[in-house]
């Protein structure tokens, strides 16, 4: 068969962002309506290839060295020498996608350090429902084969349908990366390729945690527990997690490479990911004993200590209960006491699933909320609490906890509301090839004081954080893709502040709330408004004679000041203020000032108009000096935010991002002329809107002419 090269269609720019938001509101990105990754439609592409008799070749992730990697697996690396790309049909006469269902033996690690990903894939094989949410049915190398396959992955709040061709990296006639033990099944190798595609390359998959794979295959949120310092109610947490259909994994840390695969005296394997499949209390000689059921998906080596299959402890358990609990299949599944579990294992991971992944009506489900956000230099990247001058500019989110946990959920403890917070930074694996790795991230939780409870969702300012300590926080700031922590707090309102550790570190993030009871959430942001003074109505007689004399001197014979003359005047005046950092006013900024003040529409300023502008600039100068806190002659981007508010404008964080991008220098400094231009522009746009909003409903409608008139000449 010939190959058909398909080139993806990309949509870029602001219009794409608007289009994406509208589509999301209509349900695009849910699992049942997954986004076609890079615009590639599996059914259409497959049909086209079948019709033309060609095999699919994916130019969005082509079979070239750059798809392998950028450093250790880069184009000039010795590790990639001799690698070719071949289809399974070129390697075998009868390749298979899946044989007799997916099993752990389908997943053997190759020459890539992505065991974390393979452990997550192996866990999927234990749950057919979850597996086939990722690996859709109906794919094969026989009926309807066209060299194209697809998989569904969760990516930062959205499900995407990822198309791949079946050209796989081969060296010495064998698959370089993931392969099956039998050598004739290829679903796992193709799934790995799809995951490499969304992350930019195979090398981008090197190094990670199983929880990352769990989340991208389920859309769930993961909790980590170091068992040496686990909370006292961990057994109850495990019971609740199993009750909610969560995936649980645990492992024994290794101290060196030599420890990997080492088997302990009681037949536990170090460095392997075990699954927790059950928990039960049993009556043992008159006392209740907490048990944990485990499974080693990698083999049939089983625990031989207390409560193992052949242990004597079972002889002291009621026969009926014993039959209900005892594992009869030799499949690596076994029971052990919770006390032994805490002593023998090192770490526990719990992946809490979203309601859409849980089809059973008997399973209790989490209440979930997801927010997307950004950290941008100078506007929303304030760093952690160690930086009080800027911490307050970070994005903020409010949680309202009303319902306490059920009394029987956690025993006799004090009542409270349980929830999990998870902060995830986006696209960092994909950006490794550009030298950008994980930022150090975390979050803090603040209790809203009584006087602010129920108030509008306004962004909290610096004074609040200077006066109030955090009520809770992430366990640490760390350079992982996700930081998550379980909390239990009294009913009330709380504000969550996600941040990077240091200020001015840029990135996109997802913040997720998983609560056991319903909880109200909202993003805190200021409402856009302007407290502008009424436009002055002056006559020439009211203007000071000294100012009139100055105007006559500046305006010339026509007694009006043009844009060019205004620029000369302002730059001459500003040059005398040696304490100001400025490059002078541009013609464009002076044109904006004239447009704001020009009442008769002749493109020039008369005496009254110039007088009003002059007084306004003097006011701007006093504000500028007030917020130039270090007297450097310029303001920082964060100082500018406070200065804009002092001038009467309240803006949301997105507008501040745009303003800083447009009016600050590369070092985030804002000089006086840019500050004036910004305020003039803001006032002009607010006044235009106010004029057009005749019914005062906060909405105006433009035809194309009015839109162009406003944007081109305002």
Swiss-Prot record:
Residues flagged as site, Cleavage: 15-16, 27-28
Main location: cytoplasm
InterPro entries: C2_III (IPR033883), Calpain_cysteine_protease (IPR022684), Calpain_domain_III (IPR022682), Calpain_III (IPR022683), Calpain_III_sf (IPR036213), EF-hand-dom_pair (IPR011992), EF_Hand_1_Ca_BS (IPR018247), EF_hand_dom (IPR002048)
Lineage, broadest ranks: Eukaryota, Metazoa, Chordata, Craniata, Vertebrata
Phosphothreonine, modified sites: 354
Gene3D superfamilies recorded: 2.60.120.380, Cysteine proteinases (3.90.70.10), EF-hand (1.10.238.10)
Tissue-level expression: Ubiquitous.
Post-translational modification: Undergoes calcium-induced successive autoproteolytic cleavages that generate a membrane-bound 78 kDa active form and an intracellular 75 kDa active form. Calpastatin reduces with high efficiency the transition from 78 kDa to 75 kDa calpain forms.
Protein residues bound to Ca(2+) 2: 316, 318, 323
Record text on subunit structure and interactions: Forms a heterodimer with a small (regulatory) subunit (CAPNS1).
Species per Swiss-Prot/TrEMBL record: Macaca fascicularis (Crab-eating macaque)
Record function comment: Calcium-regulated non-lysosomal thiol-protease which catalyze limited proteolysis of substrates involved in cytoskeletal remodeling and signal transduction. Proteolytically cleaves CTBP1. Cleaves and activates caspase-7 (CASP7).
Cofactor: how and how many bound: Binds 4 Ca(2+) ions.
Region (Domain IV): 543-713
Protein name in the entry: Calpain-1 catalytic subunit
Subcellular location field: Cytoplasm; Cell membrane
GO biological process, alphabetically ordered: proteolysis
Pfam families on file: Calpain_III, EF-hand_8, Peptidase_C2
EC number annotated for this UniProt entry: 3.4.22.52
GO CC entries: cytoplasm; plasma membrane
GO molecular function, one term: calcium-dependent cysteine-type endopeptidase activity
Cofactor(s) the protein needs: Ca(2+)
Record-listed Ca(2+) 3 binding positions: 598, 600, 602, 604, 609
Active site: residue positions: 115, 272, 296
